[in-house]
Amino acid sequence: STGIMAIAYAQLKKHLGISGGEIRVYDYGQQLAEIEKEILDLFEVDVVDMNNSFVGIEPGKWKEWILKDGTKSLMPAAFYPEKINGKFAIRDHTGRVALEMPENSLYFDSVNPPLENIKSINDINSYQWNYFSDEELRLMEKKAKYLYENTEYAVMTGFGGNMLEGPQELRGWMNYMSDLALGDNYVDELLGKFFEVYLTNLKMLLQSVGKYIQLIQMGDDMGTQANPIISPDLYRDKIKPYHKKLYRYIQENSDVFVF
């Protein structure tokens, strides 16, 4: 996803003298805020995320949440953090604690990688991979169609396709980086499975919203503040082939631009 942290967004509104509206945190892991139409118009923004609840047809359901600086905000209604050992914790679709927010942190960290102790290819295949449901696809189509027919914005949807960042969450940072460097622990099979899942979801997504959107946001965290996370040679060998296939599929099967 791409955006601005909710605390920073609240400070921006204060700086601009805007006291009304709401702070809606659509990405609670990174604590990213949706941008209100008043702000979009102020900065003459001409593109909008398909899921922006301030502009689109589906406002969604929200619940109150206090940010770490005391700012009142709204979280998705499905946001159910637990307090475990002094930390806020969130479970994923498999029931494991996947995210934790320490007391002194401003966002959630990924924890408890489910494939940390991978023993065989069967561990990869038996993991509960997350595919779009028919209900999710229908809702996305409804949102994209509304924005396409009723606004002047270019419509963007986020997808990701993270071939470096995604496996890091399932294997753990240290494990996966070692796997890439050494070629161990079924790293090629894991990358292949991620690509398979991404491509399946990508095909369904484009079939549902491809005629209504103009941009699709792909992504991967490939660098630090100072350097690439992995060497260019390792990227070309392990990651780039999958990026290339995903981006090429979009280009060859839709009129959507890759961002």
Where do the PLM segments sit?
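Active-site loop segments of alpha/beta catalytic cores
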Residues: S1-K14, G21-V25, M101-S105, D109-F259
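N-terminal basic, low-complexity leaders that serve as flexible interaction/assembly modules and, when applicable
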Residues: S1-L99, K142, N150-A154, K245
